[in-house]
A protein has these predicted regions:
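C-terminal membrane-anchoring module of eukaryotic surface/secreted proteins
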Residues: 76-81, 87, 187
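Conserved short histidine dyad/triad with adjacent acidic residue
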Residues: 83-108
């Protein structure tokens, strides 16, 4: 799926900000929450976030009768680095391992989507969602059910990205919920995911470059739990996302 052509200028501004001001790490992934961005860049993110193409796509994935509610607190600029899945990759190994982002997939009728919007993809990174492969270019996006979709990323087969190759994306979040559902329920569901994401992020950052025994132990726990949960939920979890 693609954004509207009119949003190309906003993606250009965001990319320029990342290159010139954010100065992403050349070793690990780099994240910046939407609410931490400068006002002009935040405005560009808001323009993308309000894309009619994104809203239409999310409704098609759930129900045209549903409502869509943005979850701004989870939105971020993300600069990826492929570090493999070994111990030295730290918590970055999660991204290249088959995983499910959140633990709330058993809650029926409610879906939190994470939309990955590509700003640039010089690394030829492929996003695999439920065995479907997406090699996205600038302005293209894919929607992932945060709590149910098994997914991971990898570099395209037979391609070796250059040392300075970049992959920048926006991670935008939305709740799709039935029109008959009280908004307070949608807000509570959003808070569950927001708070889980905050805790997970703190653990992720703590184990990004594990050197101490506590960091290595937590890193092992994160990566092991990720694999176990993905297998358990993928095999036993029912489809409860329908509107």
């Amino acid at each position: 799926m693609s954004l509207e052509f009119s949003l190309a200028k906003d993606l250009i501004l965001i990319k320029k900000y990342i290159d010139e001001s954010l100065s992403p790490s050349q070793i690990t992934t780099t994240h910046m929450y939407e609410n931490k961005l400068p006002s002009d860049i935040k405005n560009s993110v808001i323009q993308v976030k309000n894309s009619n193409n994104i809203y239409s796509h999310l409704l098609k994935l759930t129900s045209l009768k549903n409502k869509i509610k943005p979850v701004t607190e989870m939105n971020e600029v993300y600069c990826s680095k492929h570090r493999g899945v070994g111990c030295k990759a730290g918590s970055d190994a999660v991204f290249e391992t088959k995983h499910i982002d959140g633990p709330f997939g058993m809650i029926p009728k409610m879906t939190l989507f994470r939309c990955i919007v590509t700003i640039c993809n010089e690394t030829e990174t492929e996003t695999i969602v439920k065995e479907n492969t997406y090699n996205m270019k600038e302005g293209e996006f894919v929607a992932i059910d945060y709590n149910r979709d098994l997914h991971y990323i990898k570099v395209k087969d037979d391609f070796t990205p250059g040392e300075k190759a970049k992959r920048y994306v926006l991670k935008l979040h939305y709740i799709s919920y039935p029109s008959w559902c009280p908004e307070i329920i949608a807000k509570m569901y959003g808070l569950l995911n927001i708070n889980y994401n905050i805790i997970a992020r703190k653990a992720f950052l703590y184990t990004l470059k594990p050197t101490t025994f506590p960091q290595k132990t937590l890193n092992w726990a994160i990566n092991t739990t990720t694999k176990i949960w993905a297998v358990f939920f993928y095999k036993s979890g029912p489809d409860v996302s329908g509107a």
